[in-house]
Amino acid sequence: MSACIFFASDAPLLEVFPPPEYDCLAINADDGTIDDGGADDNFALRTYPDSFLYTDKAFAVCLDWAYYTEGRARQLIDYIGSALESAPCVELWHVWQGGFYLFEERPVVHRAAVRFDEFVEDDLRELGETDLWNNKEANRLSFYCLTVTR
């Protein structure tokens, strides 16, 4: 079980892979940091087969990155813009993968929408920083969906 950010659409979404020279992470267990070099193209978008658990969109890719950078966010915004050429919207989800069925209540889904011409890097940063376990006393998850429209 872990957190996941994925993009979903009614049109196929292309997979994206980082250049092969970015195959390593520097992990410092003493201070709890991870460094992947910070290159703007050091992320992947891989087909996400479990999207049906969260959305009715037919196609999805999961974002795989060590952490947010503005340069990566700009590249993802360009990717979403390209996806909007063949679909009216792209959903961006931040969810907890698996295990939410163990709790008494279904997760709360928080939804928001933004037009692509108003979509900015901070929207991606904020989505990634959302707290999925923001109601700890009830042990109830929150999922977040930001719909980007043309």
Predicted regions mapped to residue ranges:
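Structured alpha/beta or helical-core interaction and ligand-binding surfaces enriched in interleaved
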Residues: 1-150
